[in-house]
Amino acid sequence: MKSTDSAKCLGSKSLAICCLLLHLLLCIRPAVSQTQSPQRYLHNVDSNSNNNERLHQILKGSGAGSGATQLNWPQPPKQTVPNVKTELAKLNNTYVYQNAWPANNVKLGAVTAVSFDKAGNVVIFHRVNRVWGQTTFDNRNQYQEKYRGPIRESTILALEPATGKVQYDWGKNFFYMPHGLTVDPEDNVWLTDVAMHQVFKFPPRGGDGKPALTLGDAFQPGSGRKFCKPTSVAVLDNGDFFVADGYCNARILKYSRKGELILFWGQNTFSGISYDVAPQNFFAIPHALTLVPELQLLCAADRENGRVQCFLSSNGTFHSQYHNQLIGDRLFSMAYTPAAGGQLVIVNGPTAELGIHPEHYNEVHGFVLSMRSKQLVSKFGPNNLQFQNPHDVAVTADGNEIYVAELNPMRIHKFVHRSLAKPMSLSASKDSRDSAISQAVGGDQVPAVAVHHPSGKAILVASLMLLFAGSTFALALIFARRRKRGCLPFGARGRRHAWEKSDGFKLGGLLDRDRNGFEKLDQQASDEEQETKTLASAQYA
C-alpha cells in the first residue's frame, strides 16, 4: 500500500514537470516567432511614387496604430577613430633624406614648386626675397606691393639631381609672387603668379625670357576668363592643359593647346549651401594638379578639405577621391608615379590654427598612398622628422626619388628610396663638414690626445655630484607636476591655458562660421599659415 502511494506521488510529480515544460515551450515558441516575423526594412517603393506614399509607408511601419511593430532602421557601420600618433608611428620610412643636397652655394627664398625637365634636372620656382604677408593683398584680392616691381633675381633654378648644383637659371625681372611650376612633355615651362593673377607658358629653359602664351589680365583678379590667384597647371601629351584657379574661384579649367577654353568645373566649399562633408566637385582651394596617364585622370589637391579628387581628363567627370585620417584636414600637394601599381606621393600641412594648442593631433609628413588599396604605404620627412611648411612635391617615374619644396624653412629637399641609398645621419654630415674644414685650414694631421685615468677619489666625488643633481632634478619635476595639477596652495590654478581656447583666439573665429564641419576660410589665406605665438607674427604664402 505504501509503495503504491509512493508511485502515485512520483507519477504526479512527473506529470507536473511535464506540464510545466510544455507550458514553457508553448510560451517560448510564439515569442521567437514574433521577433522573427516583422520585416527589418521598408518595402521597396517605386521611384515614381510620390512623397505622400513614402510618408504613409514610414508611418505605417513605425508604430502608428494598434498591433504595429517598431521599425529597425539599418544603421551605418561604425567607424573606429584611429589614434593618429600611434598609427603614424607604425608607418615605415621607405625614403632616406639626403642631407648634403643641394649644393651649399644654392641660395633660395620660399620654394613654391618643383618639377623635372626632359634632361632630368630638378626645376624649382622660388620667391627670392618676397613674402606673402597679411597686407600683401586687400579684401578684393588686389596685390598691394606692385610698387616694388618684379623680383630682380632668377626665380627659376634647374638643379642637377646628383650633385644639386645649378645647371641653369632664369626668370629675372618678371614675376611678383611665384606659385606653381610645371614642365610639360615638350620641355615648355608653365608658371602661375598669384600677384599677377596670370598663367604663363615659356619655351624650354625660358627661351628669350618672353612667354609664348599668357592667360589672364595682369593684376586684375576676376572670374570668367580671368583668374584669381591661380595655383597650378597640368599638361596632357597632346598639348591640352588644365589650370587650377585656386584661392578665390575654386575651379578647374581645361584649355586647348592654343589656349582656347574647352570646359571648367568646380564649386567653392566656402560659399552657398553648408555641408558636413564636402561633396564631389567642391573645392576648398584646389592647390595642385597631377595627371594619371594610365587611367586618363586629372587629380587635384583639395587643400582645405584634406583630400585628393580625381576626374576624367576628357570631360571633367568625377572619378574618385583619396583621403586618410593620418594625413589630416590639409593636403597641399601630390604627385603621381606608376611605380608599385600606381602611387600618389602627398605632402600635408600644419594645422590652420595659430598660436594655440591644435584641436586635433597633426603631424606634417610626406606620405605614399597606393591608388589600388587607397591605403598609406609609408611616410617620409627630413631625417625621419616632420616638415614645417611643405608646399609642393615631385616624384620620378620609377618612384626612386622624391623632391619636396618647402616655404619655411626655405628649402628644396631630396629623398631617395632606401633600396638605393644608405642613410646618413646628421652627425655624419657634420663630421664630413668638419673634416673638410680641417683639411682646408691645415691638412690631415690628427692632434695628439692625452689619455687621463681618473683616481678612485675623483670617481667618488663625481658620483656624489651626479646623485645630488639627480635628486634635485627629481624634486623639481615633482614640484612642477603638482603645481600644474593644482595640488599646491599657490601657482597657476586660475591661469588660462593655451588649450582652453575660445573662438576669439582661433583664426576661424575671425571669420564667419555658418557651416557644420568646415570653418569659413579667408580667401586670402596663404600657404604659410604656420603655428606661431601671435597672429601678428604669422606669415602668409
From Swiss-Prot:
Catalytic activity from the UniProt record: a [peptide]-C-terminal (2S)-2-hydroxyglycine = a [peptide]-C-terminal amide + glyoxylate
Region (Disordered): 521-541
Sugar-modified residues: N92, N315
TM spans (from-to): 459-479
An annotated Gene Ontology molecular function: peptidylamidoglycolate lyase activity
PTM statement from Swiss-Prot or TrEMBL: N-glycosylated.
GO cellular component: extracellular region; neuronal cell body; plasma membrane
Protein name: Peptidyl-alpha-hydroxyglycine alpha-amidating lyase 1
Organism: Drosophila melanogaster (Fruit fly)
